[in-house]
Design a protein with these regions (language model features):
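Aromatic-lined carbohydrate-recognition surfaces of secreted/lumenal glycan-active proteins
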Residues: 63-65, 94, 130-143, 224-257
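Histidine/cysteine- and/or acidic
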Residues: 114, 118-122, 220-230
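Glycan-recognition surfaces
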Residues: 148-184, 188, 229-336
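Short, well-ordered loop/turn elements at secondary-structure boundaries
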Residues: 55-56, 89, 127-129, 235, ...
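Generic alpha-helical structural element
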Residues: 65-72, 220, 316-320
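Aromatic-lined carbohydrate-binding/catalytic grooves of carbohydrate-active enzymes
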Residues: 58-61, 66-191, 195-214
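Carbohydrate-recognition beta-sandwich/jelly-roll modules
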Residues: 1-91
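Short glycine/threonine-rich loop-to-helix capping motif typified by GTGT followed
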Residues: 214-221, 254-255
Length: 336
């Protein structure tokens, strides 16, 4: 952090609890460079040995920002039919949260919503010329899920209690990525989604749940990077859009990565939410994230600034605000 009042730069590394057997070790490495913005960031990523997995720019559709969890087979098919009039071959058609029974129960879609499963919808997207994408949150499960009820030993424990990551859904808990049965389950999940159901891209959310803290063997950042490497090993060459993940542990591992907060259906949410934190749901904050993290795009991965809106219904953004959001996203992103 930089304190402009005192002209002091403070650098910290989160390695609380990590134990070393003795001898010397590097606390962290520093990189100093001068030049234009492009020269400096190109040199830094070269020193890191980091290159993006793809330079392909994606555009497409997500079910989340209009239907949210209120999706079913008919509504997804309706949206797919609409996308045929807007998008080009090779664009992305992505089904978001709401297809599963409960977060954590990934092996079968909700039969009440998707009685024919998801394979027919992935096939329909392919027949329309689109890539098929699907949302999951692999490192967490909600309290009411069958996974949580049947496998409490799979949950990451702190002082004998499961670690609660947040209050979404029925509240949700972190999975222990060191548990061999957790790893086997998640491999089975990705085999099903990517091979059996035929999806080309997975949007993986709430990834921070893998590493809420470090331990005696590894720092929090090291654990997060190891979790990301596990995801890549399970997904092979399929496309990954990472979400809810610290930006650096995802460098060079995911194809695309969210680099900021969610946009909202209005400019800056209600007043009391502005007292919360910077990464809250906010179109205004999202635009700032996209601008000030622009250097990651095309160097670490394709940056995902979140969506922009074309519709007029169910959206309180003015035309100027929608245009500003779309222009900033178009300038500094790898996925639209």
């Amino acid at each position: 952090s930089y304190d402009s009042r005192t002209a002091q730069l403070r650098i910290e590394r989160d390695c609380a609890g990590v134990q070393h057997t003795g001898g010397s070790f590097p606390a962290f490495s520093l990189f100093f460079a001068e030049g234009t913005e492009d020269e400096v960031f190109d040199a830094w990523f070269a020193a890191l040995g980091c290159r993006p997995r793809t330079t392909r720019r994606l555009a497409g559709y997500s079910s989340w920002y209009n239907r949210y969890q209120n999706i079913d087979e008919a509504s997804i098919q309706e949206d797919l039919n609409g996308c045929k009039t807007l998008f080009r071959a090779g664009d992305l058609f992505q089904i978001d949260d709401g297809w599963e029974r409960k977060v954590g129960d990934w092996l079968e879609p909700d039969p009440a919503k998707f009685p024919n499963g998801l394979r027919p919808l992935a096939d329909a997207a392919h027949e329309s010329g689109f890539l098929a994408g699907l949302w999951l949150a692999p490192f967490v499960c909600e309290k009411e899920s069958l996974l949580c009820k049947n496998h409490p030993d799979w949950l990451l424990q702190v002082d004998g209690q499961p670690w609660c990551c947040g209050c979404n859904w029925s509240s949700f808990y972190a999975l222990d990525i060191d548990h061999p049965e957790v790893q086997a389950y998640l491999k089975q999940v990705f085999d099903s989604v990517l091979q059996d159901w035929g999806f080309d891209l997975v949007k993986l959310d709430f990834l921070y749940g893998a590493a809420p803290f470090g331990n005696a063997r590894e720092s929090r950042a090291g654990r997060m990077q190891r979790a990301m490497a596990l995801l890549r090993s399970w997904c092979g060459d399929k496309l990954i859009l990472g979400c809810g993940v610290p930006v650096m542990p995802a460098f060079g591992i995911v194809d695309y990565c969210r680099i900021g907060c969610d946009v909202g259906l209005d400019w800056d949410d209600v007043w009391y939410m502005r007292l919360f934190h910077r990464e809250r749901v906010s179109t205004r904050q999202s635009i700032g994230n996209t601008i000030f993290r622009r250097q990651l795009n095309g160097r670490a991965y394709g940056s995902d600034p979140d969506v922009f809106f074309l519709r007029e219904e169910n959206c309180k953004l003015t035309l100027q605000q929608k245009q500003t959001l779309a222009r900033v996203n178009a300038m500094f992103s790898g996925i639209l």
